[in-house]
C-alpha cells in the first residue's frame, strides 16, 4: 500500500449509527421500533441501488421516505404525514458510533485531510454532521447529489478523488458497508472495512486492504 495522504469516510453506518432511529420508531409504533429500523434501512439501500440501475436518480431524502412507506405497509402499520415527517427527521439526527469522535480527533491531529462521501444529499450530510457538532473534522462533505447516481457507482468514488485532489492509491476509503467497500476497492482505493458486526465480506472479486472492528482500531493501524 502506498503512503496514505487523505481519508474518505462513508457516513451512514460507518461514522453514524443508522439504527439510532430505533427510539423514534418505537415512540411512533410501540413494540415495532427494531423491526421498522431494520427493514427501513434494507429498503433504503435497495431503493438507492435500483435508482442507479434504472437511471432514475432522486434525492436520498425521497428514497428514504419511500422506503419508510414500504416498511410501514409491509408491517401493517397505519401512517400519516406527520409521523412520516417526524421519522424522516430522525435520519438527520443520527448518533455517532461511540468510537467515532475519539478516532476522528486523533486522525485530525495527524494532519491528514478528511472527507465524507455519502449517498446522502448535501442537506442531509450537513444536518447530520452539524447536529452532532462534527464539522471540525472534515475538509469536504461530498454528496452523490453532484453526480446524481448512488454508490457504489464509480462516478461517486471518482468525485471523491477529484475533490480531495489526491491520487486514488493514496486515498484511504473507510466504510462499514461491505457493498460500499467493494465498490471503492474496485475503483482503486485502498479500503479499510469497519466490520462492527463480525459479518462476512461480499464475494464480488475484491477484498479490503484492512479489516478492523471499529474506528479506534482503524486509527491505531493507520497512525501507529
Curated annotation (Swiss-Prot):
An (S)-2-haloacid binds at residues 11-12, 41, 118-119. Its EC number is 3.8.1.2. It comes from the Bacteria. GO terms for molecular function: (S)-2-haloacid dehalogenase activity. Residues 175-180 are annotated as: Important for catalytic activity. Pfam families: Hydrolase. The record marks 14, 151, 157 as: Important for catalytic activity. Belongs to the HAD-like hydrolase superfamily. S-2-haloalkanoic acid dehalogenase family. Catalyzes the hydrolytic dehalogenation of small (S)-2-haloalkanoic acids to yield the corresponding (R)-2-hydroxyalkanoic acids. Active with 2-halogenated carboxylic acids and converts only the S-isomer (or L-isomer) of 2-chloropropionic acid with inversion of configuration to produce R-lactate (or D-isomer). PANTHER family: HALOACID DEHALOGENASE, TYPE II (AFU_ORTHOLOGUE AFUA_2G07750)-RELATED, HYDROLASE, HALOACID DELAHOGENASE-RELATED. This is (S)-2-haloacid dehalogenase H-109. It comes from Pseudomonas putida (Arthrobacter siderocapsulatus).
Amino acid at each position: 500500500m502506498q503512503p496514505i495522504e487523505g481519508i474518505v469516510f462513508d457516513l451512514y453506518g460507518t461514522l453514524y449509527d443508522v439504527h439510532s432511529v430505533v427510539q423514534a420508531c418505537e415512540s411512533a409504533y410501540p413494540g415495532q421500533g427494531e423491526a421498522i429500523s431494520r427493514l427501513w434501512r434494507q429498503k433504503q439501500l435497495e431503493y438507492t441501488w435500483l435508482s442507479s440501475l434504472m437511471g432514475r436518480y432522486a434525492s436520498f431524502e425521497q428514497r428514504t421516505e419511500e422506503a419508510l412507506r414500504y416498511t410501514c405497509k409491509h408491517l401493517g402499520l397505519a401512517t400519516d404525514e406527520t409521523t412520516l415527517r417526524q421519522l424522516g427527521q430522525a435520519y438527520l439526527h443520527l448518533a455517532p458510533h461511540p468510537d467515532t469522535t475519539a478516532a476522528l480527533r486523533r486522525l485530525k491531529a495527524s494532519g491528514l485531510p478528511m472527507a465524507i462521501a455519502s449517498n446522502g444529499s448535501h442537506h442531509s450530510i450537513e444536518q447530520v454532521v452539524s447536529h452532532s457538532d462534527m464539522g471540525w473534522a472534515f475538509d469536504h462533505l461530498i454528496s452523490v447529489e453532484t453526480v446524481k447516481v448512488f454508490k457504489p457507482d464509480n462516478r461517486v468514488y471518482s468525485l471523491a478523488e477529484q475533490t480531495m485532489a489526491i491520487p486514488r492509491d493514496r486515498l484511504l476509503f473507510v466504510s462499514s458497508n461491505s457493498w460500499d467497500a467493494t465498490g471503492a476497492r474496485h475503483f482503486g482505493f485502498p479500503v479499510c472495512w469497519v466490520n462492527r458486526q463480525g459479518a462476512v465480506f461480499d464475494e464480488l472479486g475484491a477484498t479490503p486492504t484492512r479489516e478492523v472492528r471499529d474506528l479506534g482500531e482503524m486509527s491505531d493501524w493507520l497512525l501507529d
